[in-house]
């Protein structure tokens, strides 16, 4: 039995006693740019809880429990742990999540934030606030998660940069200023001032996770410690004394207890943001108070496959108490399930607990159909609204084809891939039913590399992986004429036009301000007031494609039997959006409008096999007559480089169809922000490193979709079609419908 399991079992009674008192619970996690030291920091917290030997803390990467994480020294999944800590004579339960820092794994961060009330943001003292720091802080603030700051790797300022005590102080103040600028930019208005970091109040710690020490300004003032003393500790070789006097775990856990709100406080402002139900109802009040005696409501943040126990759903109990044997209802999936076991997590280890009350993070066995983002409730609450859906900031834009060496193992491979997509919804799986071709899409090449490694580990199946391909989108640039779609039996006729969907509406869909599930009157009001839609169109929204950001609108009046075929038209619309007519890439940002219809009176002549193709073909014809184009994904680069190399770095970016968006200079460093196509990004890392003789930091993340250059568009579409085995010639509207 591992020491972690022994200690948790020893503390289990205390943990369960605290778990019923929300004031003594904190839900927090690490957030950071890649390689800024999150997991090493978490190791120090484990050491403080007695779960890791002091000799290996800082080296063990205990929360990196997937073997490839330890191999790559990088977190690729979010790991949970429950820590017992005494502070001010009281015991506390700190539910802690270690999240990935690499941009390819922001989906794991998104899911983790749902269960957190506070984020310990780790920043490298040399690199400072980087792109991914900005991304995770923005994500946290959108979920109303309060950030606190740990400036790590102070040892680098002393040993590598050889800064004086005064320069170290200036560097720290500069990072705090940059960090507060993010809070000013992204925090909810009511928290912009309250959540800014004030080092004098102990909301910022500095130290070295590697050397296991950390200190806040109030601690330093109380102990009479100055920056010169810290420099001396490194220069004269008594860093161990720093770690003895100011152990990092104690400093960080104290900062979390003092500045991360307990669940009964945090839920008062988080629930109105996360849940659209009636706050004055019994369940609404229980959610606001994190009431352990209220009805059970759980938000699922992740689902993992266990080879023995099946799918394990992890989430936060926002209200009530969940017990082994309880029946729960999965909203949206319309099914009841029985909880077979309840656990808390200790890295990779699950510890069985008899129950878990509101305010805590819990893992459940027996709810195999639950998915990340789902809401689980007491069956009597089946009709309440679910929690808001999670918003992922990166889209799967890189694709590989996977083929088993032995065709007989295809089914096994597909099953394992389906499990991977359940665990990580930012992966996208497409299987061609005719050819059996498997296409797996991810946020980036590393995302797919990790996914295929996991696939190999789990299945032991030999398979080949193609070089990465980029996913594109299709869209239109103007309104089309009206086109008629006839059903195959010629008994039904549907009339559509398409036009670009305005950016405001796309953003309303992306931020979940408008959804398919919400009250149509409420949705129509938002579309009128925020996006300028006319009343008839706003009321006529039939369906919202929130994956690719398209809508279908009914502008007809008095059409007989239209209600009976409405669902088939919506299915035809979704079918069309999955793969457009230009190059079978998904359609994005299009409004499809139904203006007229002739529907056969006999149900036998107006089934899905008649209505769906009529819908799809008419939409494709309209699409091709509305100046269609291809959208390509762009990445944003944030670069820090010595000023001498600005010219060389700019040349590399320009060579790859990139554009410099912004450039500033401070002291010995220049800061560049650029954008370039994902298609051009595969070799840029080596080229940037060579151009700047290695003296460069940079990070990349998904930026936006942009039209492919017009001058190269026709040839590019032909290339895409050829790669997919389609006729090179771009189709015409009359290839889908008769001239009308």
UniProtKB/Swiss-Prot annotation:
Coiled coil: none annotated. It comes from Pyrobaculum calidifontis (strain DSM 21063 / JCM 11548 / VA1). Residues 23-264 form the tr-type G domain. Belongs to the TRAFAC class translation factor GTPase superfamily. Classic translation factor GTPase family. EF-G/EF-2 subfamily. One of its GO terms (cellular component) is ribonucleoprotein complex. Its main location: cytoplasm. GTP binds at residues 32-39, 98-102, 152-155. Pfam families: EFG_C, EFG_III, EFG_IV, GTP_EFTU, GTP_EFTU_D2. Catalyzes the GTP-dependent ribosomal translocation step during translation elongation. During this step, the ribosome changes from the pre-translocational (PRE) to the post-translocational (POST) state as the newly formed A-site-bound peptidyl-tRNA and P-site-bound deacylated tRNA move to the P and E sites, respectively. Catalyzes the coordinated movement of the two tRNA molecules, the mRNA and conformational changes in the ribosome. Disulfide bonds: none annotated. This is Elongation factor 2. HAMAP family: EF_G_EF_2_A. The keyword GTP-binding applies. InterPro entries: EFG_II, EFG_III/V, EFG_V-like, EFTu-like_2, P-loop_NTPase, Ribosomal_Su5_D2-typ_SF, Ribsml_uS5_D2-typ_fold_subgr, Small_GTP-bd. It is found in: Cytoplasm. GO terms for molecular function: GTP binding; GTPase activity; translation elongation factor activity. The modification Diphthamide is found at residue 605. Keywords: Cytoplasm, Elongation factor, GTP-binding, Nucleotide-binding, Protein biosynthesis.
